[in-house]
Amino acid sequence: MKAIVCLCHGYGDTCTFFLDGIARNIAAAGYGVFALDYPGFGLSEGLHGYIPSFDTLVDDVAETFAKVKGNPDYRGIPSFLFGQSMGGAVALKIHFKQPDEWNGAILVAPMCKISDDVVPAWPVQQVLIFLAKLLPKEKLVPQKDLAELAFKEEEKREQTSYNVIAYKDKPRLRTALEMLRTTQEIESRLEEVSLPIIILHGDADLVTDPAVSKDLYEKAKTSDKTLRLYKDAYHSILEGEPDEAIFQVLDDITSWLDQHSAKEV
């Protein structure tokens, strides 16, 4: 085993559907891959799609990954975070909590800022903030069709309907506010990113803002940083693009892992 890769899934995914295929590809390249469904997502316990505290969610994920890394069989093996979309925010928050405990991070269309095309207008946000105090679990946040925005290939977009355990309803009020608060925090802390990173983002992404991925690349204090922007690619660069484009992204990821795992041996 070359290294451990700990996967953090996105808001509209779980670790048992699209992410499973990504994990198998990375594992086939010689890596031990580990993932979990967040509380309230996938097969985990909790109210479906409800994030009462993003910080608590991050703590739960970090605790699980710490148990993996603490296994005596994996002692001395490099470990990497992999975060896709909202999972990119989870990975960055874990890094902020544990700045010296990971050998690098792979950030795929990371949720450093939710695109203005998806976020409700400012007056609507103020109403939702007020309502969230009274009705935090209610599904009242207006939302565009994320599959339409995220998947370029229609045939692959249609596959999202088979991910029956993924959350597909309107966001719950508290969940939406926690995600917005988290992105605001991350956007203000880009300079603190100190571990080796590769950022991969479609330049036509209308879900998470590729401009902030550029900011992350420019502002992160690590000198070991790579940015890959894919021309005309949408949000789901590992699931919703033409096959040859997906293979290119996967190759970029495994090549980066190979280079950085070799450095740690």
Explain the meaning of each model-derived region.
Residues K2, H9-D13, D203:
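Active-site glycine-rich loops that stabilize anionic/oxyanionic intermediates
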Residues I51-G70:
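Alpha/beta-hydrolase active-site loop
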Residues Y11-A23:
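The serine-hydrolase catalytic nucleophile loop
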Residues P72-S85:
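Alpha/beta-hydrolase fold nucleophile elbow
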Residues Q84-P171:
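Alpha/beta-hydrolase-fold enzymes
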Residues L195, D209-E218:
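Short alpha-helix in the alpha/beta-hydrolase fold that links the catalytic acid
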Residues K231-V265:
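Catalytic active-site module of serine/aspartate enzymes centered on a nucleophile-bearing elbow/loop
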Residues V193, I199-H201, D205:
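Short beta-strand/loop motif that positions the catalytic acidic residue
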